[in-house]
Curated annotation (Swiss-Prot):
GO terms for molecular function: aspartate-tRNA ligase activity; aspartate-tRNA(Asn) ligase activity; ATP binding; nucleic acid binding. CDD domains: AspRS_core, EcAspRS_like_N. This is Aspartate--tRNA(Asp/Asn) ligase. Aspartyl-tRNA synthetase with relaxed tRNA specificity since it is able to aspartylate not only its cognate tRNA(Asp) but also tRNA(Asn). Reaction proceeds in two steps: L-aspartate is first activated by ATP to form Asp-AMP and then transferred to the acceptor end of tRNA(Asp/Asn). One of its GO terms (biological process) is aspartyl-tRNA aminoacylation. Transmembrane segments: none annotated. PANTHER family: ASPARTATE--TRNA LIGASE, MITOCHONDRIAL (PTHR22594:SF5), ASPARTYL/LYSYL-TRNA SYNTHETASE (PTHR22594). Belongs to the class-II aminoacyl-tRNA synthetase family. Type 1 subfamily. Homodimer. It catalyses: tRNA(Asx) + L-aspartate + ATP = L-aspartyl-tRNA(Asx) + AMP + diphosphate.
Length: 598
């Protein structure tokens, strides 16, 4: 028999009345009713009410009264039925209580810095410093149990489809592509460093070259990048997947049902879109102003550049003639809104970098108003209504700028309008694939990879040799859910000549590619199958399912937005002897010192 417990704290019911039991757990609540003391004893599984009567054992009663909340105790007692008026139907044990005759304190708790039942109401820094208390809160614990269940379902889904689970190395070589690496100095090889992997990219491609047909892992990834609400600094986990002899559609046909089934299982009363529509990157930027569209928002942006090119509204007409664009953002049922509504949108647009924000209102009595309307003919107004999908009672806002900037600005205005007008569909998960990403982009006047340098360009070597680099699209794809990117993937470039050509266009010689990615280029010389993969983010998926405001709420021991572990005190200084052993010396710049001190 276990000396600490005969039952768990969720197990007792009326069938146990009269039994002698042993329970262990934390003191969750105490209620002192004069000569009777009630204690809610909590373990991982549930809560059982304990009762102590001063008239039965005054010494035990006084001792129990003195013990602090969250102390760990072991009790022995007799199960008794509660009186009818004290039954608690919200507890599985709510029909019984345990009359305690023995109580041992296993570990006494100090005065609590946070109130466990409502720990999520405390400042985040305090919660993270005392995360071991925060994790005892039911709401926080339920997020972690959801995380465990989601990962378990991911494993089952992949194994049922014939994928094998692999663990790739944590200590590897630094890569020049992507985010900043976390470096680990080598003691044995002075002056050299390992890197923590940003993703298992190279290793999973090498597994395909090794003949492992279908692979997955719940992969830890490490990137030295700033935090966002949907991104934790330091590390994150992804369901990393790779397959041999597949096309883009093959990857979609595997991953789409996996994600749909997982979301359906854990969505509760929320709906899940039955299909994942395909939206090209180009269309996403035009229609939604972002490559991460929230399809719960029904507003669709339209291009109305041609209308204004032929109009008398010189500000827009001359801009379009110089190569700028005009985007229209509908605002349904707002034509009768006060002037302050429109002025606030203009001010918002200016704050995010727009030179201004034009608008037209189409009243239900067919009156057309707004600072732009008087410059347009009836035909032009009708064309705008058709292109923007607006009618009587609606309004439409206009952004004019270079195409990329106009997309960014109109996307932000679309998001604001969707929220303020309460247009965002509630209690649903809306997915889409974003496809046909540009292969290249210009950064600081130089050609660079826009997404994944190891993806296959559509059109292969011919496209790289004969097309405008900015017109080349790749077999790259994202999955977006409710405006959050939850996965990226690609069909990989498995042909060495195409790889060398692609890298040469961004300034790498074949020798430089071999030096940086030698393991991969060596493998490409010995027979590599066509292959592709995808990597849904575990943390973001759980964050969406848990419906929490930031990703730290679903990570057991997260870093702060400044990349600090307040519980463990990391990052921390190390002593000089350790640095000497690693052949390292510190040279902290004034700029870095300022960041540290702040």
């Amino acid at each position: 028999m276990n000396m600490y417990r005969t039952h768990l704290c969720n197990a007792l019911n009326l069938s146990h009345v009269g039994e002698e039991v042993t329970l262990s757990g934390w003191i969750f609540r105490k209620r002192d009713h004069g000569g009777i003391l009630f204690i809610d004893l909590r373990d991982f599984y549930g809560i059982t009410q304990l009762v102590l009567n001063e008239s039965s054992d005054q010494e035990l009663f006084n001792y129990a009264r003195s013990i602090g909340l969250e102390s760990v105790i072991t009790v022995k007692g007799t199960v008794a039925a509660r009186s009818e008026d004290t039954i608690n139907t919200s507890l599985s044990t709510g029909h019984v209580e345990v009359a305690v005759h023995t109580l041992v304190t296993e570990s006494a708790a100090d005065a609590l810095p946070i109130h466990v039942p409502t720990s999520t109401n405390h400042p985040e820094d305090l919660r993270l410093k005392y995360r071991f208390l925060d994790l005892r809160c039911d709401k926080v614990k339920s997020n972690m149990l959801l995380r465990s269940a989601v990962i378990s379902e991911m494993r089952k889904a992949m194994e049922s489809r014939g994928f094998i689970e692999v663990q790739t190395p944590i200590l590897t070589a630094s890569s020049p592509e992507g985010a900043r690496d976390y470096l680990v100095p080598s003691r044995v090889h002075a002056g050299k460093f390992y890197a923590l992997p940003q993703a298992p990219q190279i290793f999973k491609q090498l597994l395909m070259a090794s003949g492992f047909d279908k692979y997955f892992q719940i992969a830890p990834c490490f990137r030295d990048e700033d935090a966002r609400a949907d991104r934790s600094p330091g590390e994150f986990y992804q369901l990393d997947v790779e397959m041999s002899f597949v096309t883009q559609e093959d990857v979609f046909s595997v991953m789409e049902p996996v994600l749909r089934d997982i979301f359906t299982k854990f969505a509760g009363n929320r709906s899940v879109s039955p299909t994942f529509p395909r939206i090209t990157y180009k269309d996403a930027m035009l229609r939604y102003g972002t490559d991460k569209p929230d399809l719960r928002n029904p507003i669709i942006i339209a291009d109305v550049s041609e209308v204004f090119l032929r109009s008398n509204f010189k500000t827009f007409q001359e801009g379009v003639a110089r190569g700028m664009v005009v985007r229209a953002i509908p605002a349904p049922k707002t034509s009768e809104h006060p002037r302050s509504f429109f002025d606030s949108k203009v001010e918002y647009a200016k704050k995010i970098g727009a030179r201004g924000l034009g608008y037209i209102t189409f009243s239900t009595d067919n009156t057309v108003k707004g600072p732009v309307a008087k410059f347009l003919s009836d035909t032009e107004l009708a064309n705008i209504q058709t292109l923007a999908g607006v009618g009587p009672g609606d309004s439409v806002f206009f952004v004019s700028d270079a195409a990329d900037k106009a997309a960014e600005l109109s996307g932000s205005v679309r998001e604001l309008l969707g929220t303020e007008l309460n247009l965002i569909e509630k209690d649903t998960f809306k997915f889409c694939w974003i496809v046909d990403f540009p292969y290249f982009q210009y950064e600081n006047g130089k050609l660079a990879f826009s997404h994944n340098p190891f993806s296959m360009p559509q059109g292969g070597l011919d496209a790289l040799s004969s097309s405008n680099p900015l017109d080349i699209v790749a077999y790259q794809y994202d999955i977006v859910c409710n405006g959050i990117e939850i996965s990226s993937g690609a069909i990989r470039n498995h042909k060495l000549d195409i790889l060398y050509k692609a890298f040469s266009m961004v300034g790498y010689s074949p020798e430089a590619v071999d030096a940086e990615f030698g393991a991969l280029t060596r493998a490409f010389r010995f027979g590599v199958p066509p292959h592709g993969g995808i990597a849904p983010g575990v943390d973001r998926i759980v964050m969406l399912l848990a419906d929490v405001p930031n990703i730290r709420e679903i990570i057991y021991f997260p870093l702060t937005q400044m990349g600090e572990d307040l519980l463990m005190g990391a990052p921390s200084e190390v002593n000089q002897s350790h640095l000497k052993e690693l052949s390292l010396a510190l040279n902290i710049t004034p700029k870095a010192a300022g960041k540290t001190s702040s």
